[in-house]
């Protein structure tokens, strides 16, 4: 969501410029020279909203843009659209979905209210570092870094799937999840008093369990063998060594234990037994 007060002398516009992925191991993931390999199509538009259809190889998703105030959406070139407001105050929201949204997306004000409530709960209902009584001259900077890390981990590593190794900051390891790293990214949620954020991701393990059982069977093992480098589908990413690594295997057990310590209930035990 974005809200801005605009100048008539310097009108601002919002660019929607879509790249093709590089497929690189470690880069910004943006290939701006491959417009022939993907497309962006305006499939609907009215005075206050528009829907773009994105197609990359076998993947399709939709970008819904909604704005308040007069504005014009124009196509500048392939995969490049610009939204230009004509009023002095302008707000808009943007939503990315696998299908066309069946209901209107939230307005700027609605997103602002939800976001404000979320962060108020995050900072007041969990733990936070306080080194104000420390006499070491480094204490203030250390506290700043700890609190900043709590924020950065919350915005990048608390989704419905495991985060990639560098979160949303950068594209590394082809943008894949590395399940041995999920402990470092997410164990801290339960320890800071936010077990619900950890639980949000752990449900992903249930959806990919059948694939993990197939991996174990293929390799001659009983039970489950969690994939090392993967994506939302749970399939193994190509790797010379990834399929043979085992350091990601115990993480789910320990993370489930953290959830139980935060909420020792029979219901949680039954859900984890599944």
Language model segments and positions:
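Aromatic- and histidine-enriched alpha-helix N-cap/loop-to-helix transition segments
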Residues: 144, 176-183, 190-193, 243-251
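Conserved small/polar residues in nucleotide/adenosyl-binding loops
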Residues: 273-274
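Core alpha/beta catalytic barrel or barrel-like domain that forms the active/cofactor pocket
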Residues: 219-222, 245-258
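Well-ordered alpha-helical scaffold segments within catalytic/enzyme domains
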Residues: 128, 151-154, 184-197, 251-265
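The substrate-binding groove and active-site-proximal loops of carbohydrate-active enzymes
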Residues: 128-136, 171-176, 238-243, 258-270
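Acidic/His metal-coordination segments adjacent to aromatic residues that form catalytic metal sites
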Residues: 162-175, 226-242
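Acidic/polar, glycine-enriched structural segments that form the non-catalytic walls/loops
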Residues: 1-176, 195, 205-213
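Carboxylate/His-rich catalytic cores and anion/metal-binding grooves
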Residues: 179-224
């Amino acid at each position: 969501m974005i809200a801005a007060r605009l100048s008539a002398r310097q009108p601002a516009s919002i660019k929607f410029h879509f790249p093709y992925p590089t497929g690189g191991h470690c880069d910004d993931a943006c290939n701006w020279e491959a417009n022939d390999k993907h497309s962006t199509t305006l499939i609907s538009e009215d005075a206050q909203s528009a829907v773009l259809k994105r197609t990359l190889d076998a993947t399709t998703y939709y970008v819904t843009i909604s704005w308040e105030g007069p504005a014009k959406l124009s196509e500048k070139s392939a995969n490049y659209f610009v939204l230009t407001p004509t009023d002095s105050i302008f707000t808009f929201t943007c939503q990315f979905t696998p299908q066309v949204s069946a209901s209107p997306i939230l307005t700027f004000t609605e997103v602002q209210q939800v976001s404000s409530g979320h962060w108020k709960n995050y900072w007041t209902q969990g733990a936070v570092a306080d080194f104000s009584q420390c006499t070491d001259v480094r204490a203030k900077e250390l506290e700043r870094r700890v609190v900043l890390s709590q924020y950065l981990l919350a915005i990048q590593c608390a989704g419905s799937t495991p985060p990639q190794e560098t979160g949303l900051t950068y594209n590394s390891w082809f943008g894949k999840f590395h399940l041995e790293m999920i402990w470092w990214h997410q164990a801290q949620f339960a320890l800071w008093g936010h077990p619900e954020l950890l639980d949000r991701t752990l449900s992903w393990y249930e959806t990919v369990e059948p694939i993990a059982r197939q991996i174990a069977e293929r390799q001659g093992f009983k039970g489950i063998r969690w994939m090392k480098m993967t994506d939302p589908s749970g399939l193994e990413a190509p790797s010379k060594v990834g399929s043979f690594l085992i350091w990601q295997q115990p993480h789910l057990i320990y993370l489930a234990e953290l959830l139980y310590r935060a909420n020792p209930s029979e219901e949680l035990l039954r859900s984890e037994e599944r």
